[in-house]
Amino acid sequence: MSKRDFYEVLGVGRDASERDIKKAYKRLAMKYHPDRNSGDAGAAEKFKEVKEAYEILTDAQKKAAYDQYGHAAFEQGAGGFGGGGFGGGGADFGDIFGDVFGDIFGGGRRGGGPRAQRGSDLRYNMELSLEEAVRGCSKEIEVPTLVHCDACDGSGAKKGTSAQTCGTCHGHGQVQMRQGFFAVQQTCPTCHGKGKIIKDPCNVCHGQGRKQKTKTLNVKIPAGVDTGDRIRLSGEGEAGEMGAPAGDLYVQVHVKEHHIFERDGNNLYCEVPVSFAMAALGGEVEVPTLDGRVSLKVPAETQTGRMFRMRGKGVKGVRSAALGDLIVKLVVETPVNLSARQKELLKEFEESCGGEAATKHKPKAEGFFNGVKKFFDDLTS
């Protein structure tokens, strides 16, 4: 059976650049790869055909011969190139698929020998009072972690000895497995990717190069932090393997509930009780802030639930120098534990206002009852 044109196989024109050829090859190789088409003989043939076309068209000398003579250039005795299939020189699978199959099939090429594992990151949950969060503070914490073993200087080998190069992977930490025409790199099963074998392990860390320890750290909390904020302490996580960098420690902030204030961003909220008389006649009430007490003027005829904004009496955020506001909600308290005389006076006051049915001095009641009347009128109309 005659061979298909190599340009047709890859779906590119004869003027295609090497980049276009490589792009087409990757797409088709992924489509017909045996690992994706197990037991499909047709896909295997197409994969072989695509590979052969790629090897010819990305080799300048072979491409020139193919462009001039076609497939005849690679037949026995036609030009000394030898077979144009898988057995020829061709491209290195690892170079071609390093960025494509590395994640899909685990076969991505990794250069530079074994890679020591960076230490794991750690998290510490820290509770703060509102005052501590707003003003900033320093906190001493204890963190159980893995630290560099001083006895073996992190090598894992007993003092006076050293780790030996792994004989299986020759220090690379990986071995190459071939599945047909496809090369896959895997972690070395002997040294588990470290590239070295410890024959005489350290008595302190038992060959790990790291040991358990509880570290005491002083953490500076910046002013303005809030629940959900995270403080990163670089290099304070677990020690890395074989001298690799340590991980980081993340301090997760949680601000406890306050008995007076609620915080929303840079604003603070609080409720302040006022007497029935002050709400009706007006006056002044002391309001708490994080910096001390301040006076708030209460206008006459203030209704319960009215909000007052005290500008600049909130807090500064960790990312902003602007002060928030204090939002004060006045709550009119109903008097309790009244004496007989006090009850008498209240009854006299109620009668002076026209009794329970009167709404002249009760703006909310007037609005409410008018609304109720309209509601029932609409139902019966």
UniProtKB/Swiss-Prot annotation:
The residues the record assigns to binding Zn(2+) 1 are: C149, C152, C202, C205
Entry GO CC = cytoplasm
| Residues engaged in binding Zn(2+) 2 | C166, C169, C188, C191
- UniProt main location, coarse: cytoplasm
Q: Which Pfam family would be a valid example here?
A: DnaJ_C
Which positions does the entry assign to CXXCXGXG motif repeats? 149-156, 166-173, 188-195, 202-209
**Subunit composition?**
Homodimer.
Could you tell me what this protein does?
Participates actively in the response to hyperosmotic and heat shock by preventing the aggregation of stress-denatured proteins and by disaggregating proteins, also in an autonomous, DnaK-independent fashion. Unfolded proteins bind initially to DnaJ; upon interaction with the DnaJ-bound protein, DnaK hydrolyzes its bound ATP, resulting in the formation of a stable complex. GrpE releases ADP from DnaK; ATP binding to DnaK triggers the release of the substrate protein, thus completing the reaction cycle.
Q: Regarding domains, what does the record say?
A: The J domain is necessary and sufficient to stimulate DnaK ATPase activity. Zinc center 1 plays an important role in the autonomous, DnaK-independent chaperone activity of DnaJ. Zinc center 2 is essential for interaction with DnaK and for DnaJ activity.
- The protein in question is named Chaperone protein DnaJ
Species:
Vibrio cholerae serotype O1 (strain ATCC 39315 / El Tor Inaba N16961)
Primary gene name: dnaJ
